[in-house]
Amino acid sequence: IIFNGNNYAPEWAEEAEKRGLPNLRTCADALPHFADKKNIELFERNKVFTEREVRSRMEIMLENYSKVLTIEALTMVEMAKKDIYPAVNEYLSELCSAAQSKEQMGGNTKSDRELIQKLSADNEAMYFAAGEIEKLLVDAKEAVGAEASARFFADKVIPAMQRLRAYADEMELNTAKKYWPFPTYG
């Protein structure tokens, strides 16, 4: 099957449906199909794997998926709480002082106030998004089995990580370079 378009574009989902192909969006969606009956039969017929070996490999891949996402989520939370949050607060402090000085001199501070409010709201939202991820990681330990754990990460943890990332990305655009704690493209 050849598709020379962008497989990440929404058009691909439509094209896959037209061609009768599955559109498995996450590893948690795709990995369980490794042990589909037709795949097991193929592996056994060609003496590659037994059914037990196929299921074992699938289980290992699902466990690895959850473990890698745990590490990524913990890293993200640490970066948000220990690096971004304090850096943006430091920048906010400077912005507030500058706005106050401008106001005392009769200057216009409307843009300063808007930026302060936006950064403050985004920083607070990011902080609470990090807390949400921490709670989800505790909840993830309750998932029974590798497939249930992978499904939990795909359905709950990844969307929470995407929310945190959106706040951090927005703050990166609005924070002075000297305060941002990580290299940027700018």
Would you name each region that the model predicts?
Residues 1-186:
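C-terminal amphipathic alpha-helical interaction region
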